[in-house]
Amino acid sequence: VIYQDLLDAGLLASYAAALNSRAGGAHAPGRLTAEELRDRILESGGRCEWCGCSLVNAAFELDHILSLSRGGANKASNLVLSCPDCNRKKGQKHPARFAAEIHLRTGRKTALVMRVFERYGIQPARQNALFAAEAPELEKPNNPLSGQLEPTSYSWPE
């Protein structure tokens, strides 16, 4: 199988310049080159590194894992290929929080999600069902928890 790199060098250079400009405005360390962006895109295997969806012939974005506003560096090691949906949903969230959201929403543990879990010491767990369709025992009139369930709050890294 012969693979042909169809990434436009001019567009990559423009994208790198835009990322570098944004990083400069945030006083973030690091400077990216078009070659580093190309390498990150090719390393992703054509999938969103957050949710795992295919990005072949689809729109994609490069996302800082730890956002520049949170002190993240403008380096290739802090970049992932992301679908527009994941990039928008992540926004300025801490990567550990977003990785947990991805895992809860999709059930997937991409290599990036697992790397973030490992980095921040997160043990993924499945939450027990709270709705009657998933837990018919909660529907029973003699259930002592009936009407007493409250939302759970979590502490996330700042």
Residue ranges and their predicted role:
Residues 3-50, 113-122:
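Short, charged surface segments at domain edges that flank catalytic/cofactor-binding sites
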